[in-house]
């Protein structure tokens, strides 16, 4: 179907023409003529790279141009929010303003009222609903990308609560991978189901077993090893994406492939890859990445820093990196297709031991094969070492993905959501809570909300006992200040209880390590794991720092305690300005893990401070916690705090300024630019920016130094 034939605003057609889109894929045409443009709900369950986002874009923009109002586009990951934000920016030329909202869960963000299209993570939007942001009543369209995550243990319940809240308030468009029970999900949403297996690039799937690829069409092809599949793709000037089940395996595999693949590269490519490797910040994880990069290979997992992940994704898309070995984080929606996808593992470790990776996830990995516009066909191959190819084929290639089931019974999330219903949506009786639950996917799947009755009563009594709520003489449930603050902080009531119980000890004897250990014990922070080899070090450190902790080692739950303790030690090293590389080496963590726990820890220290305020602790306690929050955010000692308000100044530059004698803003403001330029890591642009921030406009013209080539060319 031609774009011209669509009954949409002509201005939309112009923007699509500029993008080079004149024809729609069959599932796009089906979706856009199904009633979605008339405001009807839709569930679009089609393969990866079949143009789901474009359907949502056209539906949103057409509706907003016609009626005004707002649209919210929900994504599961911050990185995906950034990607979608860039895509939606195209529509600003039609006068629609696009904003992105992630993180900071303690804000109404009324500034978003000035925007038309808001890209947000589910958790952020859930927190905005709790804060009662006034602009939400103007939301006409809610798009839920990766809606199949409603079946995920971690985030499913949050997504389900959001959709239940918005079902009768806005048009719902769900974008999903191929799932086992789309009809059931569509019926709950009262949505038209658009289901298709059509792909813009044909997908050829097979199983590698004992030296042969057994293709689903019955053909076989000989390859001496699975690695030969990668080398073969490179000889054909194509890239490969290899999925493995563990970070360490991703790194090891990338380094092994790199040794051989460098022989296939041109001198120009080797030179560019060397430059890329040299641009990485120094730390043990990046050393391995740099080594792999020099052979045209990279690994990609959640332990990489954000900049490194972006660098890998962009250079793989460009074709400079030939192979990426990834854990399934890359298959979670980030747009990085490859000609050939190789799935090395169909099992993974979990807290319950080894378990099969779900069919849905394997099929999503395989769906990354084939790059629209570049490949006529994409190839996805599962490597089997023990199972017969026919068994693997039946299960993962011909098999139907698992059905989605509501995760509303997840106690931790249910605790927070029930408090939110009482504290921010003013539900005042058990009856109202049950009525709400009757509208959920949980109830739709035939599960009687009253089967949750015992659990809900337990949660309500927990909230009552810990002074989050009260029950009046008229049997009305009312939120108390602690309950209201906890719901708006977007933390688990159990976290708030731990804070409440520990604050008297903190007031008596405040110390950073003890506080960092407390927040690491809460359900809102996933603590760092540790291996057997680390146990002696952790036990030694525990006996050294025992007096600083507010909890003693619980031998019955030693693992939980020591994971939290290791996390606290990492955070403590971070706020004492231990270089990142040293932290990575000493504590056997990855840079990405440091960023993850720092971001969550800052939020939890802030929440602890807010709970202290609500419970009317002294200003000294509140100031102490605010100082610690800033230290956690920037990774600095206390004396550097005044310097952190300067633009372009991070922990390293702040320390360099301090050590050079610039210990406060006044001394920097009164300094000569030449003095500031002598500080390590401080260049002309930075001097101009920090002085401008302090009210001094300067323009620095740097003359070339004597003896340099530039001096002779431009004396």
UniProtKB/Swiss-Prot annotation:
Q: Where is the Helicase ATP-binding domain?
A: 33-197
Q: Which InterPro entries match?
A: DEAD/DEAH_box_helicase_dom, Hel308-like_dom4, Hel308_SKI2-like, Helicase_ATP-bd, Helicase_C-like, Helicase_Hel308, Hlx-hairpin-Hlx_DNA-bd_motif, P-loop_NTPase
Per UniProt, the enzyme's principal EC class comes to isomerase
Keywords noted in UniProt? ATP-binding, DNA damage, DNA repair, DNA-binding, Helicase, Hydrolase, Isomerase, Nucleotide-binding
Q: Motif Q motif at which residues?
A: 1-29
Binding of ATP occurs at 28, 46-53
Keyword Magnesium present in the record's keywords: the answer is no
Q: Where is this motif: DEAH box?
A: 145-148
PROSITE patterns given in the database record: HELICASE_ATP_BIND_1, HELICASE_CTER, Q_MOTIF
GO MF annotations, alphabetized: 3'-5' DNA helicase activity; ATP binding; ATP hydrolysis activity; DNA binding
One GO-annotated biological process of the protein: DNA repair
Please describe the quaternary structure of this protein. Answer: Monomer.
Family, per the entry?
Belongs to the helicase family. Hel308 subfamily.
Q: What is the protein's known function? A: DNA-dependent ATPase and 3'-5' DNA helicase that may be involved in repair of stalled replication forks.
Q: What is this protein called?
A: ATP-dependent DNA helicase Hel308
| Encoding gene (name) | hel308
């Amino acid at each position: 179907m031609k774009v011209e034939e669509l009954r949409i605003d002509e201005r939309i057609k112009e923007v699509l023409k500029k993008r080079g889109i004149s024809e729609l894929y069959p599932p796009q045409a089906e979706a856009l003529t199904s009633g979605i443009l008339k405001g009807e709900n839709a569930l679009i369950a089609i393969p990866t790279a079949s143009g789901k986002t474009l359907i949502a874009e056209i539906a949103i923009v057409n509706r907003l141009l016609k009626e005004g109002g707002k649209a919210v586009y929900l994504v599961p990951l911050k990185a995906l929010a950034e990607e979608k934000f860039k895509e939606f920016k195209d529509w600003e030329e039609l006068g629609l303003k696009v904003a992105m909202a992630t993180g900071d869960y303690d804000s109404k963000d009324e500034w978003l009222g000035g925007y038309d299209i808001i890209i947000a993570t589910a958790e952020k939007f859930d927190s905005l609903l709790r804060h009662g942001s006034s602009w939400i009543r103007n939301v006409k369209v809610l798009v839920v990308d990766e809606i199949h995550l409603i079946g995920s243990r971690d985030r499913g319940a949050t997504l389900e609560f959001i959709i239940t809240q918005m079902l009768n308030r806005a048009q719902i468009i769900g974008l999903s991978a191929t799932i086992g029970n789309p009809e059931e999900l569509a019926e709950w949403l009262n949505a038209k189901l658009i289901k298709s297996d059509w792909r813009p690039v044909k997908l050829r799937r097979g199983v590698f077993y004992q030296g042969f690829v057994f293709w689903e069409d019955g053909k076989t092809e000989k390859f001496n090893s699975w690695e030969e599949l990668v080398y073969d793709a490179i000889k054909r000037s194509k890239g490969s994406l290899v999925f493995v089940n563990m970070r360490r395996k991703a790194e090891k595999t990338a380094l092994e492939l790199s040794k051989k693949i460098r022989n296939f590269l041109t001198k120009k490519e080797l030179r560019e890859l060397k430059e890329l490797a040299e641009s990485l910040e120094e730390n043990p994880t990046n050393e391995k990445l740099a080594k792999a990069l020099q052979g045209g290979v990279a690994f990609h997992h959640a332990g990489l820093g954000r900049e490194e992940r972006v660098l890998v994704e962009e250079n793989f898309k460009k074709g400079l990196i030939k192979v990426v070995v990834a854990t399934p984080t890359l298959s979670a929606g980030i747009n990085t297709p490859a000609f050939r996808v190789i799935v090395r593992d169909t099992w993974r470790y979990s807290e319950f031991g080894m378990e099969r990776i779900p069919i849905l996830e394997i099929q999503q990995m395989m769906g990354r094969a084939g790059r629209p516009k570049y490949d006529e066909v994409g190839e996805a191959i599962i490597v089997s070492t023990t199972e017969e190819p026919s068994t693997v084929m039946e299960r993962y290639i011909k098999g139907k993905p698992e059905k989605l089931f509501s995760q509303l019974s997840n106690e931790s999330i249910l605790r927070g959501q029930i408090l939110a219903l009482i504290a921010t949506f003013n539900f005042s009786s058990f009856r109202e809570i049950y009525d709400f639950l009757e509208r959920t996917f949980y109830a739709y799947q035939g599960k009687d909300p009253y089967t949750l009755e015992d659990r809900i009563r337990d949660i309500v009594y927990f909230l009552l006992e810990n002074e989050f709520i009260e029950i009046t003489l008229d049997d009305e449930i009312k939120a108390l200040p602690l309950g209201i603050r906890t719901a708006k902080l977007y933390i688990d009531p159990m976290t708030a209880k731990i804070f409440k119980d520990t604050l008297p000890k903190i007031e008596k004897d405040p110390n950073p390590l003890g506080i960092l250990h407390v927040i690491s014990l809460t359900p809102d922070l996933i603590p760092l794991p540790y291996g057997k080899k680390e146990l002696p070090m952790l036990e030694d450190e525990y006996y050294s720092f025992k007096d600083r902790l507010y909890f003693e080692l619980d031998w019955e739950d030693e693992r939980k305690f020591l994971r939290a303790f290791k996390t606290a030690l990492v955070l403590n090293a971070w706020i004492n300005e231990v270089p990142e590389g040293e932290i990575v080496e000493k504590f056997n963590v990855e840079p990405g893990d440091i960023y993850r726990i720092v971001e969550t820890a800052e939020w939890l220290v802030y929440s602890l401070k807010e709970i202290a305020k609500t419970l009317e602790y002294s200003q000294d306690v509140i100031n102490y916690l605010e100082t610690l929050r800033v230290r956690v955010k920037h990774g600095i000692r206390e004396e550097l705090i005044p310097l952190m308000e300067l633009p372009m100044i991070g922990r390293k530059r702040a320390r360099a300024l301090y050590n050079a004698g610039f210990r406060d803003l006044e001394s920097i403001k009164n300094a000569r630019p030449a003095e500031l330029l002598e500080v390590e890591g401080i260049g002309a642009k930075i001097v101009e920016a920090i002085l401008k921030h302090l009210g001094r406009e300067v323009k620095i013209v740097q003359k070339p130094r004597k003896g340099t080539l530039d001096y002779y060319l431009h004396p």
